[in-house]
Amino acid sequence: ELKELWSTGVDAYDVSLSQNFNLKAVLLWTISDFPAYSMLSGWTTHGKLSCPVCMESTKSFYLPNGRKTCWFDCHRRFLPHGHPSRRNRKDFLKGRDASSEYPPESLTGEQVYYERLASVNPPKTKDVGGNGHEKKMRGYGKEHNWHKESILWELSYWKDLNLRHNIDVMHTEKNFLDNIMNTLMRVKGKSKDNIMSRLDIEKFCSRPGLHIDSSGKAPFPAYTLTEEAKQSLLQCVKYDIRFPEGYSSDLASCVDLDNGKFSGMKSHDCHVFMERLLPFIFAELLDRNVHLALS
């Protein structure tokens, strides 16, 4: 159908002119969450090479204690040359100077198709199905992350598009806010601040205030709320925050005072919270530097 819309078009009716016309259309890009990006593009979005922009030029590394791939400090090479953060050896990966690093080459659609895909020659979508993970190809996970050739490459104009896939903002905002709130409120089992992450911080970063001490205890960090501050935040959202009718759902219903957390927040709730509450709601509850970073 997409091929037909581009090449021959379909008959449509113009009400204002009371006549038929030939309607043609083009698929400019896809919009999805990050896991669905894999299915649509053919590039697997997990593992060391999961970034579809950096591809094999990634700076990701493995966290031995957290047992997962990390992309911390992968983005300083995108800063303008001469930016002071490029030379900062203390606040990012300890001892690392990124002043001479360059971002990966920005590939055109033709380069991706004729150079990257052609060198791997992955199976087509129709041969392996939607996900295409049945058989790993040579070099998969080390040299590339291609698991199939997306059916969208069959569109004659697809290789001429520089931006073919977009990440859904609402999904990203929800994931982002969920992780922030779970860490700020120390939600058991969901906080990113745990013993394993502290051990990895000690290994890779110069942040002695977060290192586990000789007794095996983790110091209380500046980026988490005390019990008093947590209750103050929850009660503020439950009893004091009000929005015009239809602006958002009832955020008060997402407050769980007994367990000290938020639950049941939908994507739009997270969007409203980030846009309207996050810039000021932690001003008196967190350290000023943490609040500025969040807002």
Predicted regions and their residues:
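A structural signal for the principal folded core domain
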Residues: 1-295
